[in-house]
Structures are given as structure tokens and as C-alpha cells.
Amino acid sequence: MAETLTGKTPVFGGSTGGLLKSAETEEKYAITWTSTKEQVFELPTGGAAVMHEGDNLLYFARKEQALALGTQLRTKFKPKIESYKIYRFFPGADVGYLHPKDGVFPEKVNEGRSFAGKVDRRIGQNPNPATIKFTGKQPYTA
């Protein structure tokens, strides 16, 4: 995937504590988003930064940091910023699109998304674990 990311890095004073130095030999993560106005936000690595109006691009050493910033963008700002995307950069210059994988956030309903672990019954219809204890069946398959 030969995709180039565009956007300006938010303005912040400080450093990443050397985290991105190791990301040059391992992997790093980038988050991109579009803001309708210039506003201050908290960095998951500590400190604060000012996002630009328009496209923004920020690199992190860990996926959790990018996901934390994405959650903050969706919940703390008016209007909510839901147009963010997270990418993974591998050392060999390969780029992989990471989140949201199929274009819809995991907690939203998406037509065609398959169910994971769905059992067609109510909680009251679950079997009593004592009745299946020594049968060799697992409670989640009974």
C-alpha cells in the first residue's frame, strides 16, 4: 500500500521522550483527522497540543496512544471529530490501514458485519452449568 498521508502536525512544546526514535527500527502509528477549527487537545503521551484547522497528522510509537487520541476526538470536542483514521507504518516503508477497519467503528451497526459469539437465546434460557459439567461440552456451546 503506497499511500502518502497529508496534514500538518499539531503545535506542541516538548518531545515524545525518545519513543519515535525506536519506531524507526520497529513500527510506528499515525493518526489523521480533520478539524473544523483550531483547538487545544490533550496528548496521550502527556502535555497538550493545538490542532490545526483542516487536516492534522500525528505519529505515535504505540497503537494504544493513537486509539486513546481517537477516543478523545470522538467524545471531548464540539462538534465531534469522527473522521479520524489510524495507520501502521512498518520499518520497510509498508503502510497498513488499521482503524476503523471496515470504515465503521466497532460499536456501530454495520450491515453485512458478521456476529461474533452470537447465540440465539435469552440469558434465562442458558443451560444450568451443573447439568453439563461432566458431559464434555463447554457451557458456551451447549
Swiss-Prot record:
GO terms for biological process: photosynthesis. Residues 119-142 are annotated as: Disordered. It comes from the Bacteria. Keywords: Photosynthesis, Photosystem I. It holds the Pfam family PsaD. InterPro entries: PsaD, PsaD_sf. The keyword Plastid does not apply. Signal peptide: none annotated. One of its GO terms (cellular component) is photosystem I reaction center. SUPFAM superfamilies: Photosystem I subunit PsaD. Belongs to the PsaD family. PsaD can form complexes with ferredoxin and ferredoxin-oxidoreductase in photosystem I (PS I) reaction center. This is Photosystem I reaction center subunit II. It comes from Synechococcus sp. (strain ATCC 27144 / PCC 6301 / SAUG 1402/1) (Anacystis nidulans). The gene is psaD.
